[in-house]
């Protein structure tokens, strides 16, 4: 059978550009069909309501993944309201500010995956232009991938796919991704590689704190510009750390790779020149 997945992208976090791609990395998987609706960079209640209702009422997938910043904000709360009442299993993927609402999401009958290392961007006009935005998100994606956070998200969604295929009740994940959960998913062979990935994760968490200070808590331009700039420098070095971790794994031919088979099964390999099984 073919499982129909609906993905709602409202606003943007680092995981947003790759949440659908990580399910079908070579575009040759024949057991899923993905439909994506979004509201661009905005995530106001009106924009979110429009795309969420269209997903529930018109596309009607087997399950829905909503992804965006701060699940506790007004726009995402509107999405949660619609998805909770929609009769379609749904999971909310968000960043650390959503942790305070995780119990409420569970009470609404929704799953959640909250990524602590997916930080807020330094959204000050005097600093952030399209190039800086793209470079920041590229660094965040590298951290998500290299620490294992991306793999945790992918596994959670794949578990939902497999349940549909097997005719079972869809498991709604209830996951807060910490550095321990992330690195466990990466199956590091070298303990130093694991330590570097953990350090990168914690650095990315700190980036969010710095950007909150620069964007919301500091009013003077001469103070907040260097604050948000320092946050972006921090994520750049976190991305370098995950590169170092992967290079350590490459040096002993021990990089964990888990590609999807054409039928959707998750395969496994570590040696570069071996076939995944």
UniProtKB/Swiss-Prot annotation:
<dbReference type="InterPro" id="IPR036080">
    <property type="entry name" value="MTD_sf"/>
</dbReference>
<dbReference type="Pfam" id="PF01993">
    <property type="entry name" value="MTD"/>
</dbReference>
<protein>
    <recommendedName>
        <fullName>F420-dependent methylenetetrahydromethanopterin dehydrogenase</fullName>
        <ecNumber>1.5.98.1</ecNumber>
    </recommendedName>
</protein>
<dbReference type="GO" id="GO:0006730">
    <property type="term" value="P:one-carbon metabolic process"/>
</dbReference>
<keyword id="KW-0554">One-carbon metabolism</keyword>
<comment type="pathway">
    <text>One-carbon metabolism; methanogenesis from CO(2); 5,10-methylene-5,6,7,8-tetrahydromethanopterin from 5,10-methenyl-5,6,7,8-tetrahydromethanopterin (coenzyme F420 route): step 1/1.</text>
</comment>
<keyword id="KW-0484">Methanogenesis</keyword>
<keyword id="KW-0560">Oxidoreductase</keyword>
<dbReference type="InterPro" id="IPR002844">
    <property type="entry name" value="MTD"/>
</dbReference>
<comment type="similarity">
    <text>Belongs to the MTD family.</text>
</comment>
<dbReference type="GO" id="GO:0008901">
    <property type="term" value="F:ferredoxin hydrogenase activity"/>
</dbReference>
<dbReference type="GO" id="GO:0030268">
    <property type="term" value="F:methylenetetrahydromethanopterin dehydrogenase activity"/>
</dbReference>
<dbReference type="GO" id="GO:0019386">
    <property type="term" value="P:methanogenesis, from carbon dioxide"/>
</dbReference>
<comment type="function">
    <text>Catalyzes the reversible reduction of methenyl-H(4)MPT(+) to methylene-H(4)MPT.</text>
</comment>
């Amino acid at each position: 059978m073919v499982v129909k997945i609906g993905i709602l992208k409202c606003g943007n976090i680092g995981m947003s550009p790759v949440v659908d791609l990580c399910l079908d990395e070579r575009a040759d998987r024949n057991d899923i069909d993905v439909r994506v609706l979004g509201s661009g960079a905005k995530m106001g209640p009106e924009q979110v309501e429009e795309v969420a209702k269209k997903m529930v009422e018109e596309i009607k997938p087997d399950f829905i993944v909503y992804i965006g910043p701060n699940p506790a904000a007004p726009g995402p709360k509107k999405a949660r309201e619609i998805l909770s009442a929609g009769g379609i299993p749904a999971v909310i993927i968000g960043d650390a500010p959503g942790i305070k609402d995780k119990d409420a999401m569970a009470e609404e009958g929704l799953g959640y995956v909250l990524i602590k290392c997916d930080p807020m961007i330094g959204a000050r006009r005097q600093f952030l232009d399209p190039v800086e935005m793209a470079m920041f998100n590229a660094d965040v994606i590298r951290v998500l991938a290299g620490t294992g956070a991306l793999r945790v998200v992918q596994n959670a969604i794949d578990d939902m796919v497999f349940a549909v295929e097997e005719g079972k009740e869809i498991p709604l994940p209830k996951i807060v991704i910490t550095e321990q959960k992330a690195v466990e998913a990466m199956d590091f062979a070298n303990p130093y590689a694991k330590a570097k990935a953990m350090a990168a994760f914690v650095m990315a968490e700190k980036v969010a704190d710095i950007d909150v200070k620069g964007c919301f808590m500091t009013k003077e331009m001469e103070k907040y510009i260097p604050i948000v700039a320092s946050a972006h420098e921090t994520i750049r070095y976190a991305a370098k750390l995950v590169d170092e971790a992967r290079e350590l794994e490459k040096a002993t031919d021990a990089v964990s790779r888990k590609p999807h088979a054409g039928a959707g099964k998750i395969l496994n390999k570590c040696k570069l020149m071996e076939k995944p099984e």
